Each structure stands twice: as C-alpha cells, then as structure tokens.
UniProtKB/Swiss-Prot annotation:
<keyword id="KW-0663">Pyridoxal phosphate</keyword>
<keyword id="KW-0028">Amino-acid biosynthesis</keyword>
<dbReference type="InterPro" id="IPR006653">
    <property type="entry name" value="Trp_synth_b_CS"/>
</dbReference>
<dbReference type="GO" id="GO:0004834">
    <property type="term" value="F:tryptophan synthase activity"/>
</dbReference>
<dbReference type="InterPro" id="IPR023026">
    <property type="entry name" value="Trp_synth_beta/beta-like"/>
</dbReference>
<comment type="pathway">
    <text>Amino-acid biosynthesis; L-tryptophan biosynthesis; L-tryptophan from chorismate: step 5/5.</text>
</comment>
<protein>
    <recommendedName>
        <fullName>Tryptophan synthase beta chain</fullName>
        <ecNumber>4.2.1.20</ecNumber>
    </recommendedName>
</protein>
<feature type="modified residue" description="N6-(pyridoxal phosphate)lysine">
    <location>
        <position position="98"/>
    </location>
</feature>
<dbReference type="InterPro" id="IPR001926">
    <property type="entry name" value="TrpB-like_PALP"/>
</dbReference>
<keyword id="KW-0456">Lyase</keyword>
<dbReference type="InterPro" id="IPR036052">
    <property type="entry name" value="TrpB-like_PALP_sf"/>
</dbReference>
<dbReference type="GO" id="GO:0005737">
    <property type="term" value="C:cytoplasm"/>
</dbReference>
<dbReference type="InterPro" id="IPR006654">
    <property type="entry name" value="Trp_synth_beta"/>
</dbReference>
<comment type="similarity">
    <text>Belongs to the TrpB family.</text>
</comment>
<keyword id="KW-0057">Aromatic amino acid biosynthesis</keyword>
<dbReference type="Pfam" id="PF00291">
    <property type="entry name" value="PALP"/>
</dbReference>
<keyword id="KW-0822">Tryptophan biosynthesis</keyword>
C-alpha cells in the first residue's frame, strides 16, 4: 500500500485539513473564524518571499541554523553496525527544535495584529522558545504548564519567567501536557480578539499540524544536503529516526524524505513502564485507537467509553496521550513504522550518549537513541542512520539523577522536586 501512495505522501492535508481520516478541525463556533483567519494568513505567507526571507534570516542569525549533522564515530564503533549520525538541533538557541516553529507562528501573529501570545508546554522547551521570541518582539507571553511538569522541569520554568513570561501551573488531571493544552484552548476561546495560540506540536485543529510541520521541515531539508556533503552527492540516509510525543521534531525530519522509498522512517513513542493494559505509557499508535482530542482526529489513549487516559512517561515532552494526525496517517498507510521505548531503555541511552559522545541529550531524543542502539548492531556498516537529537538534557538532570539514585537534595531545584 505504501508503494502505491508514494507520489502523494507530501501532498497532505486536503482542503479540509485531513490526512486520510485523520486531522480536521473540531473546534467551537467562537474559534472557527480565528482558525479560518489563521489559515488564510498562512496561505498568504507561504507564497510571500518577504516572509521566508525574514524566517531564513532569523533561523540563521538568531537560532544558529543550520544545526550540524554529526557523525557519532565512537557510538558507531561501540554498536558495531550502521553509521550513526545525529542531527544536532539541541544546539539551537533555546536548546531544542521548538524555536524553529515558534518563530514562524509569531511572525504570523504579528501579521495578524495579535499582541498576546499563549502557549502550552510539557518539557518546557516550547514554553522557553515562545517566551524567548516574545521577548525579542516585545509581546506579552502566557505559558500553561502542568503542575507536575512545573516540578520536574524547574530549570525551564525559571528560564520562562526570566524571559518575562507568565507561567500558569495547571492542576487539573495529572497536571501534564494534555491538561496544559486544555487550559490554553479555554484561554484562547475567551480572548480571541488580541490573543494568538502558539501550538508547539503537529497537533490541534487545521492548519496547525501542517503549519508546524512546514516550519520544522527545515530539519530534514538540511539533512538532505548535509549528508550529501559528507557521504557523497545523492546519498540519502537509509533510516531516519526521531522521538514522538505530539511529533513535531519527527515530522520535521521525516517530511522531506516521505517521497524517497529507499528511506526507512521510524518514530519512537514513549513506552513508559511498558505498553500493556495498565496504560502506564504514552504510546498512542502502539497502544491506542482513533478518537478526537484538541481539535483533531488521531490515535489516542482512551478507555472503552472513549474517555482520554492520562498515560505515563519519564519524559515530560512525550507525556501526551495522542499524536499528530499526519503521523497517524503515515502509520495507517505503512509509510512509517512506529515503535516504543521504555523509561529504563531511554535512561540507558541517555547515559550511553554522555559516555560515548560527550553529548547530554534530553530524555525525549534519548528514546530515539535507545531504538538506534537496538537496530544499529544488526545493520551493515554502510547503512546510514540519522536520528534527531532534538533537545539537550540540562532540563532533565534532576529527573535523571533521581532515577539513577543520585542525591541532589542539597540543591534548591532538588529540594523543589522532593516537595
């Protein structure tokens, strides 16, 4: 089936914002005019050379793009199989891939005359990126963050506040990313006149999934020419791998390769404590089924009555009970493969990256790296894997320390996490 559809993989979504049966826009009447206005503005921006010239300038001179494509030589030798490259998006300004998309959305917000920006965040990286760009352009910034995530991502909370953002802890549900997104949507409904909702992932109502994907696709576009420079003209990766919560970093890497049938595409979900009936994971594609959440139809963790389940992951950025609709479509068509990695496996990969390459990864890309360590030894030495190192691990050191048994309670952040 995947071979039959190969010419259409990059054409979505359709005019209704759907990827097959997934996507769409399930929003209130209050929000629909704003959603349609946003779509209209983005369609204009997409063909506006001045918009992309400003984006290119900001990506280069503010973010620091292109991010390096790094051959992980020691890790490759240690694994003893395929060549492993890391796309180093953790070296971006703000420390993750999130800023790629935030810049685009806030440029759109300014074109629409919006003066107040709201965002949701889980790991804090989207919140930091949004606060950063708002500070640059002098815009008011409000970030919704689950109370549980506020505790486990304390360094990023301080960064957001230092940058001038108001951080609102969300206490409903489990206090994680889903709950933060719920409250951000409620805010947007009541403040449509001056407020722009800057969504951090390839989820939400159309046009967000496509718009965020387009801004993040700079990742995969760079990989295409960077790998050709290092491995020879025309050389493509044999496999691309990225971690998936909502799926923006993965979609950014995957999309430019969707029409290259020789490129294997693998998304790595958060397996938490194991993908089983206990639902102590956030592997929506591996352990969920289709439903509607946050304005779009996609795969979700839900019970027999259709109620959304909380899920679980050591990684705040992957702790989301759904997935972007384009990923759901790629899963259904067979163009991409989706697997899960447990917390334990991600922690092992985190430590391996530190020891082998001197790179402290965030817990999110540690999931992708864990799958690399599983498959690379079984692949030939001329097989090239590119994984997206989508964030750095500064924000996760207290979480990792606690799970590895290190006592950091004498630090202020450590005391906060103990409480």
């Amino acid at each position: 089936m995947a071979e039959d559809l190969i010419n259409s993989f990059m054409n979505g979504p359709d005019e209704n914002g759907r990827f097959g049966i997934f996507g769409g826009r399930f929003v209130s009447e209050t929000l629909m005019p704003l959603i349609l206005s946003l779509e209209e503005e983005y369609e204009k921006a997409k063909v506006d050379p001045d918009f992309w010239a400003e984006m290119d300038d900001l990506w280069k001179n503010y973010v620091g793009r292109p991010s390096p494509l790094y051959f992980a030589e020691r890790l490759t030798n240690h694994l003893g199989g395929a060549k492993v490259y890391m796309k180093r998006d953790e070296l971006n300004h703000t420390g993750a891939h999130k800023v790629n998309n935030v810049l685009g959305q806030i440029l759109l917000a300014r074109r629409m005359g919006k003066t107040r920006i709201i965002a949701e965040t889980g790991a804090g990286q989207h919140g930091v990126a949004t606060a950063t760009v708002c500070a640059k352009f002098g815009l008011k910034c409000v970030v919704y963050m689950g109370a549980h995530d506020v505790r486990r991502q304390a360094p990023n909370v301080f960064r957001m506040r230092l940058l001038g953002a108001e951080v609102i802890p969300v206490t409903s549900g489990r206090g994680t990313l889903k709950d933060a997104m719920n409250d951000a949507l409620r805010d947007w409904v009541t403040n449509v006149r001056d407020t722009f909702y800057c969504i951090g992932t390839v989820a939400g109502p159309h046009p967000y999934p496509a718009m965020v994907r387009d801004f993040q696709s700079v990742i995969g576009k760079e990989v295409r020419w960077q790998l050709a420079e290092q491995e020879g003209e025309g050389r493509l990766p044999d496999t691309v791998i990225a971690a998936i919560g909502g799926g923006s970093n993965a979609m950014g890497l995957f999309h430019p390769f969707l029409d290259d049938p020789s490129v294997n595409i693998i998304g790595v979900e958060a397996g938490g404590k194991g993908v089983d009936e206990k639902m102590e994971h956030c592997a929506s594609l591996t352990g969920g089924r289709p439903g509607v959440l946050h304005g779009n139809r996609t795969y979700l963790l839900q019970d027999d009555d259709g109620q959304i389940l909380e899920g679980f992951s050591i990684s705040a950025g992957l702790d989301y009970p759904g997935i972007g609709p384009e990923h759901a479509w790629l899963h259904e068509t067979g163009r991409a493969q989706y697997v899960s990695i447990t917390d334990k496996e991600a922690l092992e990969a985190f430590q391996l990256s530190c020891a082998m390459e001197g790179i402290i990864p965030a817990l999110e890309p540690s999931h992708a790296l864990a799958h690399v360590t599983k498959i690379a030894p079984e692949l030939p030495k001329d097989h090239i894997i590119v994984m997206n190192m989508c964030g750095r691990g500064d924000k996760d050191i207290f979480t990792v320390a606690r799970h590895l048994g290190f006592d950091m309670s004498d630090t202020e952040e450590g005391r906060d996490l103990e409480e």
